[in-house]
Amino acid sequence: MTSAQQQAVDSAQSYLSEGQGFSEQGLLSQLTSSAGDGFLMPDAEFAIHYLNPNWDQQAVDAANGYLNEAQGFSEQGLIQQLTSSSGNGFTQAQAEYAINHVYADWDAQAVDAAKGYMQMGGFSQESLIQQLTSSSGNGFTQAQAEYAASKVGL
């Protein structure tokens, strides 16, 4: 192992142990980005292959991080965040694994999302439920959205 490869391995291990949850794409970007570590692509790829992380567990870690932020993620919204190239860049299978291996109170997540919208103001019960259930919005189920609307006083 070269010195540069060892440094890339050490850096990758540090990122992976933080518990944030990195996808392979995300870790590779972090290691090679000039705003990140700036390693050469071959050294970063070596580090990732050398460490052979459990990407499913990384997806679970990322999902837990989002769920703990109190932003209000639906199951659909969380999958979109995890798989988006502008989000985490996990595969669909890794995101679905994460969804199936996190404890998520989707009703509570809907309430968190509803509280965020109510801070912006201007929502009727109907418009809030529509926003929460919209596939271009949050993607909560009708029942989750109705529960959230009732919990924020609508």
Q: PLM ranges: what are they?
A:
Residues 1-154:
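An alpha-helical, amphipathic repeat domain used for nucleic-acid recognition
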